[in-house]
Amino acid sequence: MFLNYNKSIDEAEKIKNDLINKRFDNIKIEKKVVNEDPPLPFNLVKLQSYCSSHFGYNPADVMDITQSLRETHKAITYNRSDCQYLSEEHFKEAPKTLAQIVQNIKFKPSELDPTIHSKCFNDKNITAHFAIIPTNNKVDLNKLTEREKNVYLAVCKYYMAQFLPKAVKEKTKMTIELDGEYTLVAYSTVVLKKGYTAIFKDIKAEEVTELSSIADGMYSGTAIDARFEEKETKPPSRYTKATLNEDMTRIAKYVTDPEVKKMLLEKDKDKKGENGSIGTSATRSTIIDSLITKGYVAEDGKRLISTELGRELYRILPDEIKKADMTAKWWAIQEDIPVSYTHLRAH
């Protein structure tokens, strides 16, 4: 229950010995009720990540599947969107859309309420597009392939979640100050009301302990036992197609030049969910597949690994080309083109 990170074995052993049979008169219990919003509807990157983790589909496949759902079956809205928000006009259309979805998938959550106004309905966060949602067209699930059906149902579920109550949880935190030198902390969460989570079978259960049964306040007690776990730090996980695809939406975090980082972030200032990105929703999966096709990157199961050819190319490239900084500079040049063109036409 107690957490203590980055301690040597000797330090951990000392803390453990200090704790056993020690009397504490400063055990603080804090409780807080939290209302949890449903996840936003999908944009393409989020949908690709979801389908990778739940169905094993790679990003390019999801692009093709959503293209078919949109063009052939008229089942979903524009599929290459980089936005997770909807307009107030969409909210007005919700009763009709929900009624058709319920008819299409033969499922209606008991608490579904088209008058619930979730945070996804915000005109200020709309870009050139809006979130990927079901249309109000009739869709015959029997005419969809298994992959199309899985993706369509995921889009429906995330849209319907916007019209379900928030999940209500009670979070309990226990804090013990150890001689002013260490702080020991334990947490427990209990779900008071499932709300939207009732339709998400894949959500991990909250860790509930006896701590949740203790009321707010200060307590005294004696530690009867203590132990620690010895673990080694792990290197960052290798990318999969989906995680690389998603990380390309926030490449600015890898930029060290503050001016260039500012430029990248400025590029995406009106895009919720993208923070200094490279590529677009429509091109990122193609870029990744191109690296594989050209032999610079290979797949090891789901993991992506650099090839000898890729590492050699990286070695001989100029440092400037290797950095995300170049994307910001290219963007700045492209921004100047329309201005210059307009100036030329005016003269």
Task: Report each predicted region and the residues it spans.
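Conserved small/polar residues in nucleotide/adenosyl-binding loops
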Residues: 342-347
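Core structural elements
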Residues: 37-42, 64-75, 116-135, 286, ...
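Generic beta-strand/beta-sheet core signal
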Residues: 45, 60, 72, 78-81, ...
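Short, amphipathic alpha-helical interaction segments positioned at domain boundaries
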Residues: 99-105, 312-334
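A glycine-rich phosphate-binding loop feature that marks nucleotide/adenosyl-phosphate handling sites
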Residues: 68, 87-88, 114-118, 168-181, ...
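Extended, well-ordered alpha-helical scaffold/bundle regions in very large, multi-domain proteins
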Residues: 57-115, 306
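Long, highly charged, low-complexity internal segments
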Residues: 1-71, 103-104, 123, 141-278
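Accessory beta->alpha helical hairpin/"wing" motif in late/C-terminal subdomains of nucleic-acid enzymes
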Residues: 80-98, 282, 286-290, 294, ...
